[in-house]
Amino acid sequence: MEPKCDHCATSQALIYCKSDLAKLCLNCDVHVHSANPLSHRHIRSLICEKCFSQPAAIRCLDEKVSYCQGCHWHESNCSELGHRVQSLNPFSGCPSPTDFNRMWSSILEPPVSGLLSPFVGSFPLNDLNNTMFDTAYSMVPHNISYTQNFSDNLSFFSTESKGYPDMVLKLEEGEEDLCEGLNLDDAPLNFDVGDDIIGCSSEVHIEPDHTVPNCLLIDKTNTSSFTGSNFTVDKALEASPPGQQMNINTGLQLPLSPVLFGQIHPSLNITGENNAADYQDCGMSPGFIMSEAPWETNFEVSCPQARNEAKLRYKEKKLKRSFGKQIRYASRKARADTRKRVKGRFVKAGDSYDYDPSSPTTNN
């Protein structure tokens, strides 16, 4: 049984919002999540067609069914049958029908434009496209696992995707052929040599007068030499000798090549020597590049001395403590000093005693 939209209760629910725990049709999804900036940031996805209570994460292309992660593990037999499986990326914002068609053209049938009415709420669809969708549309992919083979996620790197316009490499006219060799399908994640990124061997050299596109060059306006070396910007792309390697991996999960994106800092030391000045120029805290680690201090050496000093201070304080006697009940003490005793104990009136505080003879 097809689930109904929780908002209008008439149309088929296609979207599941985990923040609102609601099943929505496309019309109500645009209406609800365009109300305020907070709802605009809600993460949604297609609804799971098995349990109808979770966002779908995987789409079986052979069965044409969307599954959430739990249903895919326990209910579906796609893995055993060898079906083709496509991962679904969540989204946020208010995508237009054109954006929906681009994202799920192979999934939603009929097209999204046929599922959306020409009027959403009280605004025509064309007005929404010109105002809200063009200014507030944002695609936010989540939980993207980077693997060594990017063939499953070619749509994420597609030039048609408008989610990240700043990452699209713009080439000048006549320079498209030079970047055809840029293939990320078989590229490993950890690059020890900069030439491995663009598939060049160490024996290949680029002629100085050869035109290189802007996406593969360092900033042309910067002609200053690198710190601690005689290399200039014009020779930055020359291949290094086989024995010399430059490690550009700084601990990120997905290393990006500075040569590829044109972000090599002019003070980068190609010789491989790192100093505090280089990191200060690039905005990195010098605390990360100290000659000694923060835990490699002289604390172990000075520990016995500090312990002895602490013991001396404790003994001095102990000697200065005052244990003066304080009479708690002065009236009782005054009476006790005048009572008669026998073997140190008080005696009753009329009984024999061996000590009388008022008699000087008994005291002696």
Curated annotation (Swiss-Prot):
GO cellular-component term (any): nucleus
Residues in B box-type zinc fingers: 5-47, 48-88
Gene Ontology MF annotations: DNA-binding transcription factor activity; transcription cis-regulatory region binding; zinc ion binding
Annotated keywords: Metal-binding, Nucleus, Repeat, Zinc, Zinc-finger
SMART domains the UniProt entry points to: BBOX
GO terms for biological process, alphabetical: negative regulation of gene expression; negative regulation of long-day photoperiodism, flowering; regulation of DNA-templated transcription; regulation of secondary shoot formation
Domain CCT, first and last residues per copy: 280-322
Protein family membership: Belongs to the CONSTANS family.
PANTHER family: CCT MOTIF FAMILY PROTEIN-RELATED, ZINC FINGER PROTEIN CONSTANS-LIKE 10
Protein known as: Zinc finger protein CONSTANS-LIKE 12
Organism: Arabidopsis thaliana
Name of the coding gene: COL12
